[in-house]
Amino acid sequence: MDKDKRKELMEAYKQIKVYMGVYQIKNNENSKVLIGTSCNLKNRWLTLRMQLESNRHPNARLQKDWNDFGPDSFSYEVIEQKECKDIVNINWELENMEKEWLEKLQPYDDKGYNKKLMQ
């Protein structure tokens, strides 16, 4: 690859906006949700779906429902996002965003797939 082409590709890559934030996977059959965060929301659903389709997702209750209801019964939605470039401490920011949504939606027990964390 010549220098000009490489430079052009690098500039194009720098222009791609990467968003971090909070997502939910929703079981549309029983309305249960899983709340999670990612520093790359665009790629997160691909990873989650691959785990679920290969029966390797770490959340056993979500995996069971995925197997029982099928992939067409689930949806992925970004519920809050921020552009990464202006964030100093991404992990801290994601943790706080997730805490807010967990508090708001309470996706535990019959309402969801998240586990309550001990405070």
Q: Where do the PLM segments sit?
A:
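Structure-specific nucleic-acid interaction/processing domains
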Residues: 2-35, 39-119
